[in-house]
Amino acid sequence: MLNIGQFSFHSRLLLGTGKFPDFDVQQKAIDVSEAEILTFAVRRMDIFDAKQPNLLEKLDVKKYTLLPNTAGAKNAEEAVRIAKLAKASGLCDMIKVEVIGDDRTLLPDPVETLKASEMLLEEGFIVLPYTSDDVVLARKLQELGVHAIMPGASPIGSGLGIVNPLNLSFIIEQATVPVIVDAGIGSPADAAFAMELGADGVLLNTAVSGANDPIKMAYAMKLGIEAGRLGFEAGRIARKRCATASSPLEGMSVVE
C-alpha cells in the first residue's frame, strides 16, 4: 500500500491529466492505468465556472483522489494562493507544491519550494513538494514535515528517464516519508527502474498523454510499476565482475 497522510492507495501510479488528445482518450487511459490519484494544474482549469468544460465534470470523482498542483507559481506566495483556491473549491486537502525557478529547464526553485511547503503545512495541507534530485533539499523538506517527497527523474516532459539514479537512491535511503518519482519518465522501463530503486510510487503524464497510443501506454506503465515494485521486494542479485555458473558443478562426471 502507498500511504500518504491519512490516505492509503493500492496503486503506486499517479497520473497527470494534461495534454491528452480528448476527454474520451483521457478517461480510457485513466481506467486502464488503475491509478487512484489524479493530478491537475489548478490554474489551467476554471473550477468555479460551470460553463467551462473540465476534467472534474467527466470523472466519477468518488473513485479517485484528486491532487491539485500549483503549476504556474513563481514563488511561495503564489503557490499558497493556488492551493487555497483548490481547497475552497472543495477538493482534497492534499496539494502538490510546484514552484518553478527556471523557465528553460522547468526545475523547481528550492528556496521557494521550502518556503511554500512550510506555509502550507501551517495551513493544515497534506503537502507533496515537487523537487529536484538534490539529496540535501529532500532531507530539509522531510524535516519540515511534508507528507511525501517528489524528486524529478529528469526535466518535466523531457522523457529522458532517470538521469541520476545515485541521487535518487540516496533520497530513498534517507526517506521517512514516501518518495514518488516525478517528471521525466519516458517509458515503462523508466518507471520500473524507479520502483527497482525503492521508490514508493511514480507520477507521470506526458509519457502517457504524448504516446502514439495513450491508452496502451497507460496500461504498460501500470505493468512496469508493478514489475519494478515486485523486483525491489524480491531483491536483485549482487553485481559481480566475474561469472558464476548457474548449474552446480559438484557431482558432475568428467568425460575421459
UniProtKB/Swiss-Prot annotation:
Family: Belongs to the ThiG family.
One GO BP annotation of this record: thiamine diphosphate biosynthetic process
Any Gene Ontology CC annotation: cytoplasm
One Pfam family in the UniProt entry: ThiG
CDD domains: ThiG (cd04728)
Annotated residues for binding of 1-deoxy-D-xylulose 5-phosphate: 157, 183-184, 205-206
Protein name (database record): Thiazole synthase
Keyword Transferase: yes
Hydrolase as UniProt keyword: no
Pathway(s) where this gene product acts: Cofactor biosynthesis; thiamine diphosphate biosynthesis
GO function term, MF aspect, one: thiazole synthase activity
Assembly mode: Homotetramer. Forms heterodimers with either ThiH or ThiS.
Active-site positions on this chain: 96
Function: Catalyzes the rearrangement of 1-deoxy-D-xylulose 5-phosphate (DXP) to produce the thiazole phosphate moiety of thiamine. Sulfur is provided by the thiocarboxylate moiety of the carrier protein ThiS. In vitro, sulfur can be provided by H(2)S.
Entry's EC annotation: 2.8.1.10
Gene for this chain: thiG
Localization annotation: Cytoplasm
InterPro entries: Aldolase_TIM, Thiazole_synthase_ThiG, ThiG
